[in-house]
Amino acid sequence: MPYVVVFYDVSDNKRRDLLAKTLQSLGLVRVQRSVFMGRGGYTKAKEAIRAASRIVDARTDSVVALVVPEDYARRMLVYGGIMSDPKQKQAVRVV
């Protein structure tokens, strides 16, 4: 199953917090401050964009949902901790 990566630039704190909570409610996991990731394909990506369109201001904000094939996601390189796992001690991780 592919993965969905959602990243955003939202200027208003209230809208940004609401978007983060909404993405979490869709089953996505925060990997950086403005980046969420989870299993799902094109349908999940569209769901995330639809939800974002009800929250953000398209004149000043942007939200991108990217569908990544599973074999590409497994080759992801990570330096530093993943925000959803702040106790992670590994500096470099190959998924």
UniProtKB/Swiss-Prot annotation:
Keywords: Antiviral defense, Endonuclease, Hydrolase, Magnesium, Metal-binding, Nuclease. CRISPR (clustered regularly interspaced short palindromic repeat), is an adaptive immune system that provides protection against mobile genetic elements (viruses, transposable elements and conjugative plasmids). CRISPR clusters contain sequences complementary to antecedent mobile elements and target invading nucleic acids. CRISPR clusters are transcribed and processed into CRISPR RNA (crRNA). Functions as a ssRNA-specific endoribonuclease. Involved in the integration of spacer DNA into the CRISPR cassette. Belongs to the CRISPR-associated endoribonuclease Cas2 protein family. The lineage of its organism: Archaea, Thermoproteota, Thermoprotei, Desulfurococcales, Pyrodictiaceae. NCBIfam families: cas2. Its EC number is 3.1.-.-. GO terms for molecular function: metal ion binding; RNA endonuclease activity. Its cofactor is Mg(2+). InterPro entries: CRISPR_associated_Cas2, Virulence_VapD/CRISPR_Cas2. GO terms for biological process: defense response to virus; maintenance of CRISPR repeat elements. It comes from Hyperthermus butylicus (strain DSM 5456 / JCM 9403 / PLM1-5). Signal peptide: none annotated. Gene3D superfamilies: 3.30.70.240. This is CRISPR-associated endoribonuclease Cas2. It is an enzyme of class 3 (hydrolase). Homodimer, forms a heterotetramer with a Cas1 homodimer. Pfam families: CRISPR_Cas2. The keyword Nuclease applies. The gene is cas2. SUPFAM superfamilies: TTP0101/SSO1404-like. Mg(2+) binds at D9.
